[in-house]
Amino acid sequence: MSQFSRRKFLLTAGGTAAAALWLNACGSNNSSTDTTGSTSTPAPSGTSGGDAPEVKGVTLGFIALTDAAPVIIALEKGLFAKYGLPDTKVVKQTSWAVTRDNLELGSDRGGIDGAHILSPMPYLLTAGTITKSQKPLPMYILARLNTQGQGISLSNEFLAEKVQIKDPKLKAIADQKKASGKLLKAAVTFPGGTHDLWMRYWLAANGIDPNNDADLVVIPPPQMVANMQTGTMDTFCVGEPWNARLVNKKLGYTAAVTGELWKFHPEKALTIRADWADKNPKATMALLKAVQEAQIWCEDPANLDELCQITAQDKYFKTSVEDIKPRLQGDIDYGDGRSVKNSDLRMRFWSENASFPYKSHDLWFLTEDIRWGYLPASTDTKALIEKVNRSDLWREAAKAIGREQDIPASDSRGVETFFDGVTFDPENPQAYLDGLKFKAIKA
């Protein structure tokens, strides 16, 4: 298929949560689960009188994915309260489409102020290309929540092929399906989001045109495994713990973890509505400091068991610790006979500058969204990044919590190299685009 149509996008982005999505669009918040209230005693206040937030709380959304842990932990360990935001709500969203809709509503209309989100989405919202109103919704990215920790998995129908990251057997499967009158069905979590871009990159690098040789469908992350079981798709790209759960249930196997595609790649972000942040600058700083501290906590191996026990609860991920813990500590059972221990491709929350929102990474996301027609070729990427990416606030918050030594010197991480040998130079994104075989650029 050439592209997700807007109609198909609106109908499928919520997957089987469509009913909840339409209720939400009408102003109901039934598609979200409020997990307000932590189980821990708040730490001593981290604010002084002059730093006191303008409000007592913020309403944040999250999807049941391991990389939502910093937002959840900031609530559970009393870090929001520590920085003067004791009334903060952390609300489960059923899909990225619901997250989008609730951000558009804002908390004053029953929605949310900010969220754990796919890194490209704040840009697509700010550009107005995915809002239901088709109007721009200015957003800020305050931090990256994690790097790595996603996977591309296949159905057991293709277990004999044992497809890996760079593998001619993948194209053979796609060619066989096309010859039989079908297309390789690949599930992603949101059009133009990270999982969509990882899947498209993987297919294209293996000689498969995502627009003509595959059928990309949208399924919410927590519903991926159930849909694989019913044969909805042949392959999917999603964050943990859902690849691990697929393997644990013996319904499929992981071809590659996304760190194999691009080592230490950026993934989710902490986003906030720009109007909320501009109205509440001290509360925004408090929010950022709390999440940064939570990321540091999540990175500490001593906290791994507690992190898994907290997030496995029904109100958060509704899965087992066994689905979360192994891959989070770098122990990867691919489900096809391969396994690794203590892999450096595990999810990072703070180490290796995981939390810093590099503008060069956002440029790659925008370049890929231009590549596949989610943004027009005329997009002023530099201006859009300067509008959305608030690395200045990240630096200020990191300094305030005593982590000045972790502040990068530059907003660019420099040239990035992908598994197929292709490089992305943020100083020359056009050269990167020009060198790609498969693309669907729109004027």
UniProtKB/Swiss-Prot annotation:
Induction info: By nitrate, when present in the medium as source of nitrogen. Expression is suppressed by ammonium.
PTM note: The N-terminus is blocked.
Lipidation (N-palmitoyl cysteine): C26
Null mutant phenotype: Mutant does not grow under low concentrations of nitrate. Mutant is totally defective in nitrate uptake but shows significant nitrite uptake.
Transmembrane found in the keyword field: no
Binding of nitrate, residues: W96, Q150, H195, G239, K268
Signal peptide: 1-25
Domain of life the protein comes from: Bacteria
A Gene Ontology term for the protein's cellular component: plasma membrane
Annotated region described as Disordered, given as residue ranges: 31-52
Keyword annotations from UniProtKB, A to Z: Cell inner membrane, Cell membrane, Ion transport, Lipoprotein, Membrane, Nitrate assimilation, Palmitate, Signal, Transport
Compositionally biased spans, kind Low complexity: 31-46
Annotated InterPro entries: NrtA/CpmA_ABC-bd_dom, TAT_signal
Function description: Part of the ABC transporter complex NrtABCD involved in nitrate uptake. The complex is probably also involved in nitrite transport. NrtA is the substrate-binding protein. Binds both nitrate and nitrite with high affinity.
Similarity remark: Belongs to the CmpA/NrtA family.
Name under which the protein is recorded: Nitrate/nitrite binding protein NrtA
